[in-house]
Amino acid sequence: MEGVLAASLFYYGCIMTLEDLHKQVDLDLKIDDTELDLESIRTPQLHNKYLKLYTKFSLQYKKAKDDYSTVYKFKWEYYCGKSAPEVYQENPFDLKVLKSDVYIYLNADAELQQADQKQEYLKQVCNYLERVLREINNRNWNIKNTIEWKKFIHGE
């Protein structure tokens, strides 16, 4: 799926590729143990940054789901022979498909597949950002444990 969707998320109205997002998270979540006080202060900023991204991608995911439903309905009507005559003049479809076989045509439809891939891709981005936000929420706990470990090592 990544190969098909290796196009940037900008293609889907987003701002970066998923790979770019992974790299940015790797950089942002790295804790510099020589400046734990500054790292602790950075936590709310990181949370805000990724919460904004999560919100943006969640809205895009919702829109992608709605777009998929719209395309699905249009294609279902098309393959069931229920579309307007103009649709068939523009894009003829002379087969009579049994209702039990419509799903075969829907599953193989390129436009519907693309809408589904977009939806799934954005879903994965949202899931990833949810996990990133959880990790950011645990960041201060990790910093606190690092400070306590350093105190223990130095006999304090």
Where are these regions (language model features)?
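Charge-rich amphipathic alpha-helical interaction elements
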Residues: 8, 12-156
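Acidic, Ala/Val/Gly-enriched low-complexity intrinsically disordered segments
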Residues: 2-7
